[in-house]
């Protein structure tokens, strides 16, 4: 349905209601009193300058003794497929969305507020196909652990992007966008996950894979959270929102990811690199890393892979240079940090930037997070007999050796950060730790690795005038 056809259908409903009012001999003022609203609202609706919401349509139809089912059927045929992408309560994009058999999910853009384009999602391409791709990226991924169990509680399947959107309204803890029917009157303040409690029951399903009937659930950030491992968002009363994340399962060398998160953030802290803080907790009998949400209602996280058309390490470095020294140095420091801890999973979805939701400006590098596949998390006991040899078998996702990456990005600042790691020792958790012999072996290897990386010559200048090293 085109925007013109949609407008014509709306006008048809309004005309029928206006005719019914006149036939009843009611003035706009009298009708307004009957339904508990202002005459100005009735006037604007009949002039076509105000959308007729579902709630108001039902009240007017009842007051005029019109068949509500006929009104609903007519409205449904025109409005059920029309959605709006909003930032807070500001509509950025209006589009239709419908399943078309073998063609699959199809969108048609009706109107885009191009004057506000600086506020649009950075990874949204303003084409019909681009809208569908953006929606598909926004919902829970098919490879997420317990995805079927999560969606089954809501009567949904993993391929039902529109159905998932209808339930969760596209709400997320990454940003402040949401996707709702075009005539939806609700306010963002009443629905967002930052300020409103979300389904604890669905969080348990997301984390344990076990849950009850769909009646127990409401919308949840689980429906728009990426990643493979078991995880769940929890609202901790008086403290904030936390992500609980488990480890891999099914083999003798799995399950160590939460430990790696806990210990890796200690290394980042020692180096003086901005990092999300992790703790460890047994929740529901399952070991989890626990970290506080680092976005808020005013600030969003944008993965670098959602910004760059070409996702290569060189493209990332070039882009960060355009953002300024702070951004570029943080990226270089992260890459050296990853080389130090042998992080094998620094893909283009788990690092990026923070954005001001109100202005659309990129304001800072995001803190480092998601270090679970590091510190030899998959190493078997035999591997620790010669950890240096095992370390040489580890690699990053870029198909470039850690050492070659460091040769490109090593600067005076990174050298100063590495020097802080000399004689580093982990702080043990009060109750949840890797075996002591494993920890001491990792500490020894970190010492060797620190010396190796410090031997790499500085290829670029990072020191400004009157700025001390380290």
Can you name each region flagged by the protein language model?
Residues 1-23:
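A short, Lys/Arg-rich alpha-helix, primarily the initiator
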Residues 15-34, 59:
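Short basic helix-loop element that most often maps to the first helix and adjoining turn
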Residues 23, 49-52, 343:
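Helix-turn-helix/winged-helix DNA-binding modules
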Residues 33-51:
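Recognition helix of helix-turn-helix/homeodomain-like DNA-binding domains
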Residues 55-70:
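DNA major-groove recognition helix of helix-turn-helix/homeodomain DNA-binding modules
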Residues 75-336, 340-342, 354-470:
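Phosphate/dinucleotide-binding and metal-coordinating scaffold of catalytic cores
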Residues 347-348, 352:
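Canonical protein kinase catalytic loop motif
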């Amino acid at each position: 349905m085109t925007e013109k056809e949609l407008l014509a259908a709306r006008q048809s409903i309004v005309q029928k209601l206006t005719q019914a009012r006149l036939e009843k001999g009611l003035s706009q003022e009298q009708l307004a009193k009957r339904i508990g609203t202002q005459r100005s609202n009735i006037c604007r609706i009949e002039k076509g300058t105000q959308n007729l919401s579902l709630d108001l349509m039902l009240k007017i139809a009842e007051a005029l003794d019109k068949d509500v089912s006929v009104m609903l059927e007519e409205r449904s045929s025109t409005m059920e497929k029309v959605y709006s992408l909003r930032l807070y309560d500001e509509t950025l994009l209006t589009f239709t969305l419908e399943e078309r058999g073998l063609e699959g999910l199809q969108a048609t853009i009706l109107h885009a507020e191009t004057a506000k384009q600086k506020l649009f999602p950075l990874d949204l391409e303003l084409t019909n196909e681009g809208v569908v791709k953006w929606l598909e990226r926004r919902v829970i991924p098919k490879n997420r652990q317990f995805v079927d169990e999560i969606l089954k509680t809501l009567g949904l399947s993993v391929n039902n992007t529109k159905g998932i959107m209808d339930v969760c309204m596209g709400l997320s803890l990454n940003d402040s966008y949401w996707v709702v029917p075009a005539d939806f009157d609700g306010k963002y303040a009443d629905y967002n996950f930052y300020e409103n409690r979300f389904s604890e029951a669905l969080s348990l399903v997301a984390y344990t894979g076990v849950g009850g009937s769909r009646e127990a659930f409401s919308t949840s950030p689980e429906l728009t959270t990426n990643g493979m491992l078991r995880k769940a968002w929890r609202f901790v009363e008086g403290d904030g929102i936390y992500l609980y994340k488990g480890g891999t399962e099914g083999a003798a060398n799995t399950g160590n990811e939460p430990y790696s998160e806990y210990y890796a953030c200690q290394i980042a802290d020692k180096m003086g690199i901005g990092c999300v803080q992790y703790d460890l907790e047994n929740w529901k009998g399952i070991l989890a890393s626990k970290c506080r949400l680092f976005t808020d209602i005013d600030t969003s996280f944008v993965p670098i892979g959602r910004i760059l058309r070409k996702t290569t390490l060189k493209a990332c470095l070039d882009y960060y240079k355009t953002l300024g020294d702070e951004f570029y140095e943080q990226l270089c420091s992260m890459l050296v940090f990853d080389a130090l801890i042998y992080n094998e999973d620094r893909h283009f979805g788990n690092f990026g930037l923070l954005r001001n939701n109100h202005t659309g400006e990129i304001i800072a590098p995001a803190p480092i997070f998601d270090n679970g596949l590091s510190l030899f998390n998959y190493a078997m006991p035999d591997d620790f007999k010669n950890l240096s040899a095992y370390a040489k078998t580890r690699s990053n996702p870029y198909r470039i050796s850690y050492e070659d990456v460091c040769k490109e990005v090593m600067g005076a600042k990174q050298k100063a950060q590495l020097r802080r790691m000399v004689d580093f020792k982990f702080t043990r958790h009060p109750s949840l730790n890797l075996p002591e012999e494993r920890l001491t072996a990792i500490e020894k290897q970190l010492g060797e690795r620190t010396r190796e990386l410090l031997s790499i010559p500085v290829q670029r200048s990072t020191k400004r005038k009157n700025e001390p090293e380290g």
